[in-house]
Amino acid sequence: MSEHYPTLAQTALVAAAFKILLFPAYKSTDFEVHRNWLAITNSLPLEKWYVEKTSEWTLDYPPFFAYFEWILAHVARLVDPLMVKVYNLDYDSWQTVYFQRTSVIVTELVLVWALQTFIETAPLKSRRAAQTVALSIILSPGLLIIDHIHFQYNGFMYGILVMSLVLARQNSELLSSGLIFAALLCFKHIYLYLAPAYFVYLLRAYCLSSKSIFRIRFLNSIKLGLGIGAIFGAAFGPFAAMDQIPQLLSRLFPFSRGLCHAYWAPNVWALYSFADRILIHVAPRLGWAVNKSALQSVTRGLVGDTAFAVLPEISPRTCFVLTLFFQVVPLIKLFFQPTWETFIGAVTLCGYSSFLFGWHVHEKAILLVIIPFSLIALRDRRHLGAFRPLVVAGYVSLFPLLFTPAEFPIKTIYTIVWLVVFLLAFGRLAPASNKPRIFLLDRFSTLYIAISIPLILYCSLLHHLIFGKAYEFIPLMFTSSYTAIGVVGSWVGYMVVYFTA
């Protein structure tokens, strides 16, 4: 290990100390969501967990996460008994705040463990690069903003994902990798978007013979099938016994939401929505029809309120077909070339597809792309060229989550320092590729990062100084649309890299 880098444990310890200082910071409604889930799982019997609706923040994660909240609730009630009362809505005593913030830091140790495993199992010549990647993830601005200020438990669950991905590097651990991922699906169903890559990789590398795709390894297939069945049985079995599966699924998959969230996630539909806003002013001059009712909604993506004034409406089916198509394309290569690097690339592209074309995507889901991609970003300079605009766009797109003045210097300074330190380090560590570099991608990456600096300055500071509270949607629209260009450009660039590697 290079003496120039602190160890992962040392870094995690310093990061935890910094996160403790953020305990009094802004917290979103997600804080009350998780407090309410503590109360539901502590105060009510199992059969009422997915029925209870005293609060609007009903339990809508899979059963393993509910069991996780149940375990936390046993400690929470010792810290502050009022914290775990269902009727005690919007309760946020200092004991509650400190307990919930601490639980995020402690459970993030799963991510530290997974990243340490990633370092230790990396080839010796790649150990220094693996160390740098691990540090970049544990210090991720995304996790700091989403988990430790806004409030969620992504570090814990991405730790499970990273462990599964790392174990997949060893043929002897493929079964463990698949079972850990199955357990992850029972914690949070958003990871279903990555499941196609797992299915193809485990089918090809574990269930079929390496010599012939027509020879099935029956024992491996049985072990994998029984293991996954046991995990899903442990998660959903009790609710199936109570005939609550339809109710549970209605909580997990609510389809009444609109195409875009209130703040457009930086994906294809953000660009589509932006184009529609521009066409509202152009269409009358061209003689195009304008949907007058859609003009009533300046911010799109409110529940059940996604309407376009000029462009055609987008249906959930359209989103599903596009997502599936752009996932299947890289899976074809994975099936015929089932290496670990190709697998991580396919997982990354599945994350891209679901984020770019999915229905009602949240900006926080960008971590589905960034974290898997990080594991292979230093494979060579071509990979890094596609990765750079992704992290710039992805992390900047999270800024609107923290809209209070006190958090402005934290999110901007921390993110900019992270980008400068790690993108410079990555540039020094990424080896040259044996394939020619993509000129347009290199220029796009450099130009995109350069333009992002004044954009951040305007959207985060100058707009408010110039216009005050007027035109508040403009910086959000600019941020969403510009970061969408970065994510889409990164995706196109990585698709080229993936298929020519």
From Swiss-Prot:
Name listed for the protein in its UniProt record? Dolichyl pyrophosphate Glc1Man9GlcNAc2 alpha-1,3-glucosyltransferase
Q: Which InterPro entries match?
A: Glyco_trans_ALG6/ALG8
Which lineage do the record's taxonomy fields give for this organism? Eukaryota, Fungi, Dikarya, Ascomycota, Pezizomycotina
Topology feature Cytoplasmic, residues: 26-103, 150-179, 243-252, 341-355, 405, 468-472
Tell me the organism: Gibberella zeae (strain ATCC MYA-4620 / CBS 123657 / FGSC 9075 / NRRL 31084 / PH-1)
The biological pathway it contributes to is:
Protein modification; protein glycosylation
Name the gene for this chain: ALG8
| Role summary | Dolichyl pyrophosphate Glc1Man9GlcNAc2 alpha-1,3-glucosyltransferase that operates in the biosynthetic pathway of dolichol-linked oligosaccharides, the glycan precursors employed in protein asparagine (N)-glycosylation. The assembly of dolichol-linked oligosaccharides begins on the cytosolic side of the endoplasmic reticulum membrane and finishes in its lumen. The sequential addition of sugars to dolichol pyrophosphate produces dolichol-linked oligosaccharides containing fourteen sugars, including two GlcNAcs, nine mannoses and three glucoses.
Q: Which GO terms describe its biological process?
A: dolichol-linked oligosaccharide biosynthetic process; protein N-linked glycosylation
**Domain of life where this protein originates:** Eukaryota
